[in-house]
Structure formats: C-alpha cells, structure tokens
C-alpha cells in the first residue's frame, strides 16, 4: 500500500466530525426516529438482505460527514488495491486476497502478476473429488471401514471460522440431510481435556483427522496432531496414519515426515490470513467432508455476492462500508469501546466468537500503517450471545449500564420451525418478537414521566428509568442457508477492513500474538529441565517464579 505519514486525524474531515459530536450530544434517538425520511434513507437492501441503521446516533448530516471521511481516507483506492492484489499487508509484504477464495471460476484476480483464481479452483476441485471419495465410501480406513467421523485440528482462524459455519449449517434442512450418519468435530486447545472431549465415542477405525497448519509447525496444532497420531497408531498401527490423516498445509516436506501422504495435502497461500481463511481449504475441506461440496459451494457463492457488492456499490448504499464507517463513528468519535453481536438464531451461536477474532486481531492496533502512534482509539471489544439467551445474561448492562452499540441479526424463516397448537404465535415468532422489540427499547428507553403515569412508586422510579439513546442496527436475513451464511461472513470481514482502511492501520497482521509465544518458549524449557533434571527456577520475576514453583510442586505430570 502506498505510504503516507499523514494520520487520518489530521484531516479536515476528521476534525469536522470531532466538532459534530457536540451537536450529537444534544440529540436523542427518540427525536431522530420521528423523521420518517431519515429512517427510510437508512434502510439498505441487497440480495435478500435488509439493513436498518436508523437507530444509530447519526442524523443524515453525520452520514454525509462520514462519507467525506471515507474520501479523506482514500477508501475507494484502498479497496481497489486489495482486490488488485497489491501488498496492502505491508509489514509482511503480502497481498490480502481472501476474496479470491470464493471468486467464480472465470474471474481474474492477480497476485504478483499471476491469476490466483485458477490455483484456488484447482484446490477446490481436489477437495470436491476427495470429499466425494470419503463420503461415498470409495476411500476407506486401514481396516476397510468407511470414514464417517472427522476431527479437524487447527487453532485461531483455522478453528473459529470453520466452527462458526459448521454450527450454522447443522440444522439447515439441506445440510442436515447431507450430513446424515456423519460427525465433524474441531480440536483447537492444547489442553488435554479438549483432546479427550473430541475422541469420546469415536472409533479410530472410522475417523479421519484433518491437520490444518500452513507451515506444519504451529506449536499447539502439531502437538494435538501428534496426540491423535498416537491415538490412531495405538489402535491401528503406524501404517494407518496415511489412511486416517490428511493435511491442509504448504509444507509438503514436513507433511510427509509426519507420516501423511503429500498427495493428501491441500494447499493455501500466504495471501490468506488465518482469520480470513474459512473459504480456503482450511474450512472448505472439513465442511465438504461433513456436508458435501455442493452445499459448501453455495456458502462460497454467498460470500462472493457480497464481495462484488462491496467492490462495485457506491458507498452510500454499500452495506460493509456503511457498517464500517458507523463503527469508526461509534469508537473514535462517540467513545464507545465495545460492540455486542446479537444474532436471534441459535444456529449463529459461534458467529460472535469468530467475529471477535476477525475484528480484534485485525484492528487491535496502536500505530498507523507507517508506524506512527495513533492519537485516537481503534478497534472494538466484540462479544455476543444468541437472543434470547443474552437477554437473561448481559442485556441489563446494555440497557442501564455502559452504552454498547448492538448488532441485531434476525432470520425471517427458521431452519427448524415449530408451531404448537394453542400457542399465540410460533416459537420463531416468539423469538423474533424480541428481535424487533429490543432495538426500540434501547433507542427510546423509558422516562420518569412515563413511569409516573403508570403509577410506579416514587422509590422505584430511578431503578426503572431507562435513558435510551443507545445505538443499534438491525440486519434481517431471509433465511439461514449456506448461501446466507456466506453473505453474513463476508459482510463482517469487509466491515472490519473498512474500519482499518479509515483508521490507517494494517488490519492484516497480528504481531500482538507473538510476544507471549516467545515468553512461553522460555517457560517450556524451564519446565522440561525442572522436571527431568531438577533444575532450579531461574530468570523469572518474583511473581512468575512463585507461580511456577507452586505449579511444579503440586502438579502430577509424569517425569519425561
């Protein structure tokens, strides 16, 4: 990406918004919501989706100013650079091309002068062929039994994204039918409890293990891979590994050394960041093994639909751009540090944890892309739970405590509708009644005057008063098919990118995860030498020394 030492906060567009905040402080959502023309202008439709951001603390004037900020940040140019394969991940000198992972076969997207779409489809075709062999039973395990159970080993982006999609599809009628008789589990944590939970009830004879590590050196993933290799070889012998383990990796030498046939390794590329990799073999392979490639291809098409919308739609009607600009407004101008992601769909229970990583690992930065300290806050603390569970958990704080902008995600048609005779509404209507009510409750609140008219006792009025003026947006999906899941993923991926582009940071590196890894190496060496040679603790501060001493004295780890 072209470098510039100017910070976005030095621009007139940023300063204009800073001054505009004083006007917003005098405005309540109760008043903004009376303007029907404003509300209508804040409804956006695309490909079956409906976005309503009228409950944001933003008059039309605010949106105009945010669009000016997008121009000042050269957002159009930055989006083009991403799609054109320029090395916008400057600290690692890499392109950022997760959009190529779901591009149509005839698309042209170049990295370093080479069309990468053909490479992507070569891998997708290989996944399709392999998954069909496994699912049909033409590929069997070492003892001749079909491989109906899959454990995918990965961590971070190699785990959270595929788990989100898997959980979203489990109860989709088409996907459910395709997955009959099959299981897909995800192993991420090096805590041995996670291993134990994953292998409970599984037979090594019918289990296929997918090891996801680009370099085949990721510490946690490879330890878990060795653990499951031991589980397989103990039951079936060392030769069974080639039949029961495959890899998603580019390091074919280490794949072969591990005991996996390099022909059963599925590639991905340096221009795919881990948290953006769910549309690569990282996600497509395990998901295709569970649901069949045809279902997963619909997921890719949904994401591609949003990619094209993001690339070509004017900003005032561009869903990811509008969402990204509103997040910048909430974080950097209104001072809201967090965002609640609230899907009114149990099938989306793993969506917030995935977006938590996509957002916080991407935009949790303190310096500009040129290395300058930022004089403003970036990034959001993302969290969430499905409705209505969250209402009985943390909504109390959202309504009467800190102001936390909320994303409400609703589904028109339930994956698994239930209609009970004698009930006023269906189960899904009951759920969606809350989806429609909560944003208004946050926006309007309840005044002391209203409570007095309801004859609420004076001593309870302060406790039952709701300030309102709490921003939210609503995103309504027609249903939750594989296609819609792809749409939802891409909207949030691009929203995060827009925020980073406006803030002038690198949303595609993650140096913050490295320091802890380095320090863990020192601890690991100490644990090994203390357990095997009785070496005294050395080189740690008082606090860490005390904790390590207690751990070594009381843990029951065997001598190695």
UniProtKB/Swiss-Prot annotation:
It is an enzyme of class 5 (isomerase). GO terms for cellular component: cytosol. Pfam families: PGI (PF00342). This is Glucose-6-phosphate isomerase, cytosolic. Its EC number is 5.3.1.9. Pathway: Carbohydrate degradation; glycolysis; D-glyceraldehyde 3-phosphate and glycerone phosphate from D-glucose: step 2/4. It comes from Arabidopsis lyrata subsp. petraea. Keywords: Acetylation, Cytoplasm, Gluconeogenesis, Glycolysis, Isomerase.
């Amino acid at each position: 990406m072209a470098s510039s030492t100017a910070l976005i906060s030095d621009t007139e567009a940023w300063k204009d918004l800073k001054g505009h905040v004083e006007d917003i402080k005098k405005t309540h959502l109760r008043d903004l919501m009376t303007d029907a023309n404003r509300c209508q202008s804040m409804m956006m439709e695309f490909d079956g989706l409906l976005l309503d951001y009228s409950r944001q603390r933003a008059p039309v004037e605010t949106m105009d100013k945010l669009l000016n900020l997008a121009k000042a940040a050269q957002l159009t140019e930055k989006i083009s650079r991403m799609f054109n394969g320029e090395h916008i991940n400057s600290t690692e000198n890499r392109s950022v091309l997760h959009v190529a992972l779901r591009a149509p076969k005839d698309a042209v997207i170049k990295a370093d002068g080479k069309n990468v779409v053909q490479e992507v489809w070569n891998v997708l075709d290989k996944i399709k062929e392999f998954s069909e062999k496994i699912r049909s039973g033409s590929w069997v395990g070492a003892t001749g039994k079909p491989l109906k159970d899959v454990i995918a080993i990965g961590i971070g982006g190699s785990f959270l994204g595929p788990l989100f999609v898997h959980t979203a599809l489990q109860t989709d009628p088409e996907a459910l039918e395709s997955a009959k008789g099959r299981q897909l589990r995800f192993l991420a944590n090096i805590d041995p409890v996670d291993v134990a939970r994953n292998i409970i009830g599984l037979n090594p004879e019918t289990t296929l293990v997918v090891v996801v590590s680009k370099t085949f050196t990721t510490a946690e993933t490879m330890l878990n891979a060795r653990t499951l290799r031991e589980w397989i070889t103990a039951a079936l012998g060392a030769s069974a590994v080639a039949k029961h383990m495959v890899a998603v990796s580019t390091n074919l030498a280490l794949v072969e050394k591990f005991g996996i046939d390099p022909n059963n390794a599925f590639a991905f590329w340096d221009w795919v960041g881990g948290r953006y990799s769910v549309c690569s073999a990282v996600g497509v392979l395990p998901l295709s093994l569970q649901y069949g490639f045809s279902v997963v291809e619909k997921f890719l098409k949904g994401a591609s639909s949003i990619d094209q919308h993001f690339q070509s739609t004017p900003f005032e009607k561009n869903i990811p751009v509008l969402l990204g600009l509103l997040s910048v407004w909430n974080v950097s101008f209104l001072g809201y540090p967090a965002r609640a992601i609230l899907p009114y769909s149990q099938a989306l229970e793993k969506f917030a944890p995935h977006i938590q990583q996509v957002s916080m690992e991407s935009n949790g930065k303190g310096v500009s892309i040129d290395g300058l300290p930022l004089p403003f806050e970036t990034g959001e603390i993302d969290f969430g739970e499905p409705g209505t569970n969250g209402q009985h958990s943390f909504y109390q704080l959202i309504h009467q405590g800190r102001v936390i902008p909320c994303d409400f995600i609703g589904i028109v048609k339930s994956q698994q509708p239930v209609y009970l005779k004698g009930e006023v509404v269906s189960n899904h209507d009951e759920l969606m009644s809350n989806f429609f009510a909560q944003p208004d409750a946050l926006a309007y609140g309840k005044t002391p005057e209203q409570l007095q008219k309801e004859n609420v006792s004076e001593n309870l009025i302060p406790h039952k008063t709701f300030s309102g003026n709490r921003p939210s947006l609503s995103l309504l999906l027609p249903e939750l098919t594989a296609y819609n899941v792809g749409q939802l993923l891409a909207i949030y991926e691009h929203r995060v990118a827009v925020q980073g582009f406006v803030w002038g940071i690198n949303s595609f590196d993650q140096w913050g995860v490295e320091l802890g890894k380095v320090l863990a190496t020192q601890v690991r060496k100490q644990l090994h030498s203390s357990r095997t040679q009785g070496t005294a603790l050395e080189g740690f501060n008082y606090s860490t020394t005390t904790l390590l001493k207690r751990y070594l004295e009381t843990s029951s780890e065997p001598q190695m």
